[in-house]
Amino acid sequence: MGKIIGIDLGTTNSCVAIMDGTKARVLENSEGDRTTPSIIAYTQDGETLVGQPAKRQAVTNPQNTLFAIKRLIGRRFQDEEAQRDKDIMPYKIIAADNGDAWLEVKGQKMAPPQISAEVLKKMKKTAEDYLGEPVTEAVITVPAYFNDAQRQATKDAGRIAGLEVKRIINEPTAAALAYGLDKEVGNRTIAVYDLGGGTFDISIIEIDEVDGEKTFEVLATNGDTHLGGEDFDSRLINYLVEEFKKDQGMDLRTDPLAMQRLKEAAEKAKIELSSAQQTDVNLPYITADGSGPKHMNIKVTRAKLESLVEDLVNRSIEPLKVALQDAGLSVSDIQDVILVGGQTRMPMVQKKVADFFGKEPRKDVNPDEAVAIGAAVQGGVLSGEVKDVLLLDVTPLSLGIETMGGVMTPLITKNTTIPTKHSQVFSTAEDNQSAVTIHVLQGERKRAQDNKSLGQFNLDGIQPAPRGMAQIEVTFDIDADGILHVSAKDKNTGREQKITIKASSGLNEEEIQKMVRDAEANAEADRKFEELVQTRNQADHLIHGTRKQLEEAGDKLPAEDKTAIEEAMKGLEAALKGEDKAEIEAKTQALVQVSGKLLEMAQQQQAAAGGDAGDTSAKKEDDVVDAEFEEVKDKK
């Protein structure tokens, strides 16, 4: 069996590693570097350049030099992230026919997985040159907060590059594997703080060692994928542009060539300021006007850079608190802190993390290489080269379906270990309902519409039955790559429908973050909404039952009692159209009071009939959830 290589497909840089005996080895590319810039250029003479050669010619070819493509992979054109990048990137971001964010290069439309595949091809070639044999299988890493669409798109990129992606693995988890594999760590709980070029993740991971076998179990994960080195660069670029404008009265933003030079200089200055207290951004002939050429020479101190990005660093702290809370741990329970991603070399980042955890982060993990090493270890586990290692990862957000009253009913909660499968039995909301719509949702809110819709499908051919009698079993199945499969089965007829959530309907990371933030900020509103829905459902059941009793025993009631019940039902139905929980409760109580006589008669009638009519209602299975389907009409 050939080697399964490990690839860290990064926003800014990528890296490839293999298992060499019992050790993972990071491989040098054809330029002699252990990491490769994730930059792809299409030249005028039709050549495709990847990595350092592409970066070197970016200044003279900004429109056709593509970088930070990972920020677009698996995204819709209308997503906030894609729209923001559209305005600031020198290359052209367009809408594909299916609504995805694509790119236009030299008049040709290209999909992000197609472009990322060029980087993966270079990683594949680097491994093949070292091994002297073809490579066809890989483990590729993604941010822990990547959703279904982004994971699918990453797998597609691998396939385009000629690789069978054996496993998609989360970056912080890969870093933990790299850290824990060759160390006699015993049982430890570690925090992996991963601040890369485009994304931020935090994972709390427990490493258990029993009889030489190590289990890496992710307890909780959180993150913010609008946070990374690219954002730090942007702050410095904006500062330099404004300073130049004050000094020379010219706005460099209108000049793509100048902006490309400035981007390179800002990145270099940021890196230098991790070891030096100040640096010069010196760009002669940056632009020109009628009076002649203009030069940029601006001093930047470390303190200035820190003041520009302080809020970005602070933004990474909130997810740390949430992850610890989700794991049920406190700061004192964390034994080791591991920093991953080039941006963690910034002293300010290291200090903030050390202050939060009350301990210095470990310095024996290479932040640029740890993720690729972990991916290679997982490749070794899958190929059988690495024994005695078990990896247990989690899903970052809750998954569920919409049920009666517009409620999100979770089937799999966030931070559940994957792969996992969960089934639950639901029922129908109407008498003789022949079809149900399964509306799949992702998020933490109680109200269905406040979560992200992942897709919907119909299960029809249900046998006609009174409401609440049909048994619809919904199954959610998440595979080891974190990709979701949903099925619905009518237990009476055996009819079944399945759906694999497709990439075009995935969540973007901004939405995930928004959901989690909203869930925290709106916990009280969610609780009130849940109570309102419960009250509504109880009232709805009461109306349904009373109407049935009226049909069966109403002719034995005095006319004025019957009229009073009908009026009370009308009043309750009117209250149900509003949002006032107190009014619904009051009208429910009113209906209960006036229908007391009717209930007595219905019970007497049932007793006289030997209780036959009561048998059917007892047949409802114990595990049927008291939340029901309504048919969801597509909003056109």
UniProtKB/Swiss-Prot annotation:
GO molecular function: ATP binding; ATP hydrolysis activity; ATP-dependent protein folding chaperone; heat shock protein binding; protein folding chaperone; unfolded protein binding
Modified residues (Phosphothreonine): 199
Stretches for region Disordered: 603-636
Cited PROSITE patterns: HSP70_1, HSP70_2, HSP70_3
Entry's Gene Ontology BP terms: chaperone cofactor-dependent protein refolding; protein refolding
Name this polypeptide is given: Chaperone protein DnaK
Keywords per UniProt: ATP-binding, Chaperone, Nucleotide-binding, Phosphoprotein, Stress response
Recorded GO CC terms: cytosol
Its job: Acts as a chaperone.
Organism: Yersinia pestis
This protein's record includes keyword Hydrolase: no
Induction annotation: By stress conditions e.g. heat shock.
Keyword DNA repair: no
One Pfam family named in its UniProt record: HSP70
Cited InterPro entries: ATPase_NBD, Chaperone_DnaK, Heat_shock_70_CS, HSP70_C_sf, HSP70_peptide-bd_sf, Hsp_70_fam
Family: Belongs to the heat shock protein 70 family.
